[in-house]
Design a protein with these regions (language model features):
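Active-site residues of response regulator receiver
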Residues: 8, 52, 79
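The feature encodes the CheY-like receiver
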Residues: 14, 56, 83
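Charged docking surfaces used in two-component/phosphorelay signaling
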Residues: 15-23
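Short hydrophobic/Thr-rich beta-strand motif most characteristic of the beta2 strand and flanking loop
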Residues: 25-32, 40
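Acidic catalytic/metal-coordinating carboxylates
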Residues: 32-36, 59-62, 67, 86
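Conserved phosphotransfer cores of two-component systems
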Residues: 42-46, 66-73, 93
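Active-site beta3 strand of CheY-like receiver
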Residues: 44-50, 55
């Protein structure tokens, strides 16, 4: 099954997403800030990355751009920022999909399946 990296500074959210994805049979690794996202993406062989936009150290947009320097792995941005301009910037930084919080876990799983 696919290997997914989940990075968000909200640990409870990471735990919930991880639980749901593991129940679907995915392998899941986690991180909690933008720098960790880039390091883990570089070290791991991930099939998909779920990346929060607003995180400590470097934000999700910067992390996404840095990951794009060495990988074409599908990236889903997961964020509370729902303005159209935020979504457009996310796509311009290299995201493949953009989901706003609060979100439905069934929708997230469907979007993951669509990208894999």
């Amino acid at each position: 099954m696919a290997k997914i990296l989940v990075v968000d500074d909200e640990r409870v959210l990471v735990k919930g997403i991880t639980f749901n994805l593991k129940n679907e049979g995915y392998q899941v690794e986690t991180g909690y800030d933008g720098e960790e996202a880039v390091e883990l993406a570089r070290e791991g062989n991930f099939d998909l990355i779920i990346l929060d936009l607003m995180m400590p150290k470097i934000d999700g947009l910067q992390a996404c751009m840095r990951i794009r320097e060495f990988s074409n792995v599908p990236i889903i941005m997961l964020t509370a920022r729902s303005e159209d301009t935020d979504k457009i910037i996310g796509f311009e930084c290299g995201a493949d999909d953009y989901i706003t919080k609060p979100f439905n876990i069934l929708e997230l799983k469907a979007r993951i399946r669509a990208l894999l």
